[in-house]
Amino acid sequence: MTETLIKIENLHKSFGKNEVLKGINLEIKRGEVVVIIGPSGSGKSTLLRSMNLLEKATKGKVIFEGVDITDKKNDLFAMREKMGMVFQQFNLFPNMTVIENITLSPIKTKGESREVAEKRAQELLEKVGLPDKADAYPQSLSGGQQQRIATARGLAMEPDVLLFDEPTSALDPEMVGEVLAVMQDLAKSGMTMVIVTHEMGFAREVADRVIFMADGVVVEDGTPEQIFEQTQEQRTKDFLRKVL
């Protein structure tokens, strides 16, 4: 049986009086590609950010590789090394070259030698199709290139799972495809991925599972076929009618 990598139990998150997550229960298996869809304000990004504790849950548990990471006794930094994150706005350091951005965490947090870190960074640049950009600065790159660099940076720590928070929504339409192509290659390689996105074609083609969220709850969780073609849930139908 495939190992459960992330287990979420009765997760609640409130900002003041606004309850954004209302008792989420979810399991993510090793090697799965899980895509989370839903209308704006449904809690998708908050759920993703709660998985690696960028947002602290108000109540409930996040269990990662068998360890309750919401328990303050456990080492959050060690866990974060195993959970990569790719943000909507890239979050690259503008005063560092591409290769410095990619090697910063492996050198600083894993204690890797510069030589080892740079060798892997160059391999990752090949993987994301930007082998000649090692010495470039982020501002000289297009949005699509910056997001591919951000993905390479996420992979540099050799994480067990990569979380993507709307990785294409800040991009011009012509750049979306190049980022999705890199993500598709990662999915084929067996990388565990949890992706919040509005790209329904990608969800349909690449996901093992699609989760539809609305109003802070998981409305439906199933295969792409179950969600996109066989849903019996009215809220899912209404959402898909608007976006497809």
Question: Where do the language-model regions lie?
Answer:
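C-terminal boundary and immediately downstream tail of ABC-type ATPase nucleotide-binding domains
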Residues: 214-215, 221, 225-244
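ABC family nucleotide-binding domain
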Residues: 3-224
